[in-house]
């Protein structure tokens, strides 16, 4: 287990490279400190996630789990330390970030066309919709989706991206038991193909052999 106030050693996977790029790791934090609103959320945090690996960010509500995900995504700048890694990353946050007026398929295709994997965006979207069990509502406007369907649509966006590193912020929120099992299967398939995941959650998710990053 990695704790924010104690830099981790190499037992948690490939250590971040000396130049801070985390060469060989999908994601690497080296001595990262994050401050928001004058409050230190985590300090001198170091860990690395190798290809095929997983890290589970845990801790009480408000401790900084979502901020850590945002730092990993490049959306929040740490006050010190370095964030690196070889993998292209994609983010699943609380909001699906899909055009509510468009049919689900077209809303996902908009993002798929911009993603790291340029080939066959329509095909990638179709496969992702099938994977999350939403193929039957592909032509339904996003605004008409239920909360659980919107969460699965957000996951479909991640699946269709082709990114090597999935950054998942509370991915089980709004999902029933069957959908959480589906999420776990998709993560397992992604990891088996060499992909990596960083998951922040307060709900139980099965992540075999995942390292734990404890905040708070």
Predicted segment positions?
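A short, flexible loop at the N-terminus of ABC-type nucleotide-binding domains that lies
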Residues: 2-51, 56, 77-80
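Q-loop/switch helix immediately C-terminal to the Walker
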Residues: 95, 100-117, 124-127
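Helix-to-loop junction immediately C-terminal to a conserved catalytic motif
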Residues: 73
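Conserved ABC ATPase "signature" region
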Residues: 120-137
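Hydrophobic anchor residue at the start of the ABC signature
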Residues: 155, 194
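Conserved ABC ATPase signature
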Residues: 141-148
């Amino acid at each position: 287990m990695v704790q924010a106030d104690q830099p981790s050693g190499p037992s948690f996977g490939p250590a971040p490279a000396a130049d801070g790029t985390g060469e060989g790791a999908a994601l690497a934090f080296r001595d990262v400190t994050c401050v928001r609103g004058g409050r230190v959320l985590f300090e001198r945090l170091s860990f690395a996630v190798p290809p095929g690996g997983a890290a589970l960010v845990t801790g009480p509500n408000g401790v900084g789990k979502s901020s850590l995900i945002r730092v990993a995504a490049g959306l929040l700048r740490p006050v010190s330390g370095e964030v690196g890694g070889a993998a292209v990353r994609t983010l699943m946050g609380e909001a699906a970030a899909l055009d509510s007026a468009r049919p689900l398929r077209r809303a996902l295709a908009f993002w798929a066309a911009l993603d790291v994997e340029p080939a066959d965006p329509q095909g990638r979207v179709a496969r992702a919709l099938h994977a999350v069990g939403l193929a039957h509502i592909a032509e339904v406007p996003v605004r008409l989706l239920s909360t659980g369907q919107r969460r699965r649509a957000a996951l479909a966006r991640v699946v269709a991206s082709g990114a090597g590193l999935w950054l998942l912020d509370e991915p089980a929120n709004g999902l029933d038991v069957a959908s959480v099992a589906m999420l776990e299967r998709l993560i397992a398939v992604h990891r088996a193909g060499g992909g990596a995941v960083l998951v922040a959650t307060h709900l139980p998710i099965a992540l075999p052999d995942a390292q734990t990053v404890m905040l708070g």
